[in-house]
A protein has these predicted regions:
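Donor-binding/catalytic cores of nucleotide-activated saccharide
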Residues: 1-88, 92-131
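Intrinsically disordered, low-complexity N-terminal regions enriched in serine/proline/glycine
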Residues: 15-18, 93, 211, 239, ...
Length: 295
């Protein structure tokens, strides 16, 4: 992608899939590669060509008005294909605009007066509105994946066990929100079955965050021991920075060393609750500043 007023290092999907030569693969091979590389999100829209006669035949369309519609479209397109031709050379540029709703790097999020998103603009906080929009989008993707799974396609079970759990976990965030303008919260009860076999691990991952470590250190220092807090913060921050550097080196050695996303785990929602505790949130910014100073 070409980032318009957005600073972001980008690693393409092709890098993770590690296709270096032209090759024709089957949908089963594509899915096995995604599983091997631990890729739980797959998207496809601008980065390839499609036989439109085939597209009309399978009656696949983008879901209107959602976030990450290319994830839904890409997974089902590749699953329903007969063959997939891989051309590993990058020959087109995707421009990512600063205020686009599809700008996944975007910190600033504005709903324009004529936007289709005005119907969900019922929250008092733009960040909450954005969270609802994304969660509701993942819900619609999850429901369409489930419809595909119920069609008894030969890849149904693979989609169910590999791509669906992370989507369901993202959609279940709807339960935390007090308003539901699209009336999708009622569907959350149907999703839990698809994450029940996932391992635990998200809460433990959050406990590795610098903000959590600082919060824990702060809670341990009582009375006169508070005087030693600055030294403890520096010690914890330096050790965290060292661990982070080692982790980044391990990824460079082998991309498979990259940690699984939090939403892969069954306890994702509990991890979000821990992550969003006020003390941990307030220390997150402090932790980032410390890391930038030490870096």
């Amino acid at each position: 992608p070409l980032y318009d007023k957005v600073k972001r290092k980008h690693i393409s999907q092709m890098t993770y899939f590690d296709y270096k030569n032209e090759v024709i693969i089957t949908p089963k091979e594509w899915l096995e590669k995604a599983r091997e590389k631990k890729l739980f999100y797959f998207w496809f829209a601008w980065q390839g060509m499609i036989n439109f006669d085939f597209l009309k035949k399978i009656k696949l369309k983008f879901i209107d008005g959602i976030f990450a519609e290319d994830c839904h479209f890409g997974v089902l397109l590749f699953a329903l294909s007969k063959n997939i031709y891989i051309f590993p050379k990058q020959i087109c540029i995707y421009r990512l605009r600063e205020l686009s709703s599809m700008n996944f790097t975007n910190k600033k999020w504005i709903i324009h007066p004529n936007s289709h998103l005005k119907k969900i603009d019922v929250f008092e906080n733009s960040n909450t509105t954005r969270l609802y929009y994304e969660s509701a989008s993942w819900m619609q993707i999850a429901l369409d994946f489930i419809k595909f799974i119920d069609s008894n396609h030969y890849l149904s079970e693979d989609i169910k066990t590999h791509f669906l759990p992370v989507v369901c976990n993202k959609a279940l965030t709807l339960k935390k929100l007090d308003k539901d303008p699209l009336c999708l919260k009622k569907c959350t009860k149907n999703l839990k079955i698809y994450i029940q076999n996932q391992p635990l691990g998200a809460v433990d991952r959050v406990k590795e965050y610098l903000s959590y470590k600082l919060a824990k250190e702060l809670s341990r220092k009582k009375g006169i021991l508070r005087l030693t807090l600055p030294f403890s913060v520096i010690r914890v921050s330096l050790q965290h920075q060292k661990d982070t550097i080692e982790y980044k080196k391990s990824i460079k050695r082998n991309v498979l060393n990259k940690r699984l996303p939090l939403e892969f785990y069954r306890d994702y929602q509990q991890a979000l609750s821990l992550k969003n505790q006020k003390l941990i949130q307030s220390l997150h910014g402090i932790g980032l500043k410390i890391m930038s100073l030490k870096g």
